[in-house]
């Protein structure tokens, strides 16, 4: 059986569809036996996303919370099929972990070809660590 040691795709109350504080999430992660937790709130392209300044300020968070490594990141929105994201690379480069995802609020659905070209463009961005959904 594979043991999960971290969850790096989580949202705090900053992403308004989520309901937990950072402390609540860390407590749950400890109960699950995790060694790390990632905070990856939605970028500003989502209706409930954080403003860009939220991600700028993440360096002010501790690197550890309650014995867990705190991975500071973002789930950015893919804005077009050329790989444009809703946060600038100057902000992304300050983060530990960046997920890039398609969300219907940030981009209209299109063909499989268009979406594939978008994914291929996104993976060329050195500040993106993970493809989301």
Task: Spell out what each predicted region is.
Residues 2:
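Catalytic phosphate/metal-binding cores of nucleic-acid and nucleotide-processing enzymes, i.e., regions
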Residues 8, 12-27, 56:
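N-terminal pre-domain/capping segments
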Residues 30-33, 123-124:
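Non-catalytic positions within long, well-ordered alpha-helices that form the structural scaffold/packing
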Residues 43, 48-133:
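Extended substrate/RNA-proximal surfaces in nucleic-acid metabolism proteins
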Residues 5-15, 39-42, 131-132:
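Histidine-centered catalytic micro-motifs
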Residues 28-29, 62:
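Short secondary-structure boundary/capping segments within folded domains
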């Amino acid at each position: 059986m594979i043991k999960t040691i971290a969850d790096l795709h989580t949202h705090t109350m900053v992403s308004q569809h989520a309901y937990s504080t950072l402390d609540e999430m860390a407590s749950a992660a400890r109960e699950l036996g995790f060694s790390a937790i990632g905070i990856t709130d939605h970028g500003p392209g989502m209706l409930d996303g954080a403003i860009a300044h939220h991600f700028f300020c993440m360096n002010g968070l501790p690197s550890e919370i309650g014995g867990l490594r705190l991975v500071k990141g973002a789930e950015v929105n893919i804005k077009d099929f050329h790989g444009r994201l809703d946060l600038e690379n100057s902000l992304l480069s300050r983060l530990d972990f960046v997920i890039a995802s398609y969300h219907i609020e940030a981009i209209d659905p299109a063909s499989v070809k268009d979406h594939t070209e978008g994914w291929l463009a996104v993976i060329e961005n050195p500040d993106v660590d993970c493809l989301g959904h």
